Amino acid sequence: IIDCGERLGDGQAYKAVNQLLCSVHIVAAAEALSLAGRLGLDEESVLAAMTAGAGQSWMLADRGPRMLAGLDAPVASAVGIFVKDTTLVADLAADLDIDLALLPVAARRFAAAAELGLARR
């Protein structure tokens, strides 16, 4: 359990920050593994190297193997959840007049996946 402060709503604010990072990290991980494959590299070897180096993130280590396993991999959090969460974070950013340049990119990727019928994956 993490103490998120005394003010009402601080826990939700922490969650928004977390979801921004998670959304962007998942998309970055997918693009990195896609690049590795297009370069003719063994994606599993690249994943092992990246999770041991400066480019590692929890999402890369957790979701990377599932990405390589394909659609039969167990689902940890559905695409539809990220569609919802990126929308909530985007609304919050608009209210605060803050430019979160990577968020719209991640949001479009999740929305595109949902449109392909992967919202529950």
For the regions a language model picked out, list residue spans one by one.
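Helical "substrate-binding/catalytic lid" subdomain
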Residues: 10-121
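General beta-strand structural signal in soluble alpha/beta enzymes
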Residues: 2-5, 102
